[in-house]
Design a protein with these regions (language model features):
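Conserved histidines in hydrophobic membrane contexts and catalytic metal-binding motifs
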Residues: 2-323
Length: 323
């Protein structure tokens, strides 16, 4: 029995040592990139930024009321209707069907249902984003890159890319579906993204096995922390110190520092790694079979009810009226 215990202890020591050698750099990068993310998030176009960069909306160009736009889209009801000069600087209605799905665009002047954006329309949207004050250099079409890893952009792919000549050297991504700017990424934000979210979420490994890779690396991190805590407690003298007078057996400064710091921050490190593991919802542990919320019933009545009564204010929530 004693032999088995000693052998188990030896294997635990070896496990902690070599797992630490193999994973130390990864977890240092994970920690450092997480600190970066606390101050510089993943690039995104916030509602405030979008509203601030919308061109002035000239009410004289709006020939259709919201209800007419709804009929032009072939719908009787909608979950949401917005009017803004978001496509090539021209006024368009954005209509979200009540049943969900792709957002429809209706030209507020002609009543035509808009198709996919052309390169010329995408370029006009990019120029209008800065009020035509800066030149735009075309960067082609991309399906996904380091700054557009998000499910919210799936309906807009592929994306037109434009490098703007503004002081911040902003990169604009324009939806090929709607023709509106859906993401802005200044050069400084792009740079921090590479050492922040891009590195933290292991985006270079994104693919069919990305989720499993992150989950199992986190599991190994939990095992590394638990084994180190157990070994650290075994080696710590609670009753009487070692001959050196220290309660840690290690004479080398680095080893003694590692032993003491490991015990002090074991709980913090374990909860940090474990919370990251749980954020990935491993093996669907947070799955539910509960009945999905009936969103249509939750929203209530039809969005088209009484829309024409407030033609020039009901649909202008996302636009700015010209003086």
């Amino acid at each position: 029995m004693t032999t088995l215990v000693l052998r188990a202890k030896r294997w635990l020591y070896l496990l902690h040592r070599w797992m630490g050698v193999g994973l130390c750099l990864l977890f240092v990068l994970w920690f450092a990139s997480g600190v970066v993310m606390m101050y510089v998030g993943y690039p995104k176009l916030t509602p405030a930024e979008r509203l601030a960069h919308l061109p002035w909306l000239d009410a004289a160009q709006v020939r259709l009321g919201p209800a007419q736009a709804l009929r032009a889209a072939g719908l009787e009801q909608a979950a949401e209707i917005r009017l803004a000069a978001s496509r090539a600087g021209q006024p368009f209605y954005a209509i979200v069907p009540l049943a969900g799905g792709r957002t429809l665009r209706v030209d507020a002047a002609s009543g035509q249902l808009a198709g996919r954006a052309t390169p010329a329309q995408a370029r006009a949207s990019a120029l209008a984003y800065f009020g035509a004050r800066h030149a735009a250099r075309e960067g082609g079409l991309v399906d996904e890159d380091a700054h557009t890893h998000t499910r919210t952009l799936d309906a807009h792919r592929p994306l037109y890319v434009f490098e703007m000549d503004d002081p911040a050297r902003t990169r604009l991504y324009v939806s090929s579906s709607t023709g509106e700017v859906v993401r802005d990424a200044p050069r400084l934000e792009r740079g921090w993204n590479y050492v922040g979210a891009w590195l933290h979420w292991l985006y270079p490994l994104r693919g069919a096995y990305w989720h499993d890779i992150v989950v199992w690396l986190s599991v190994l991190g939990v095992a590394l922390t638990v084994s180190g805590t157990v070994v650290g407690l075994w080696r710590w003298r609670f009753a009487r110190p070692y001959a050196s007078g220290s309660r840690s057996p290690y004479r080398e400064r680095f080893m003694r520092w590692h032993h003491i710091a490991g015990l002090l921050f074991a709980a913090t490190t374990l909860t940090w790694i474990f919370s990251g593991l749980m954020s990935m919802n491993p093996w669907q542990v947070f799955g539910t079979r509960a009945t999905q919320l009936d969103r249509a019933a939750y929203r209530g009545g039809a969005a088209a009810r009484g829309l024409d009564a407030g033609r020039h204010h009901a649909g202008l929530r996302a636009g700015r009226l010209a003086p």
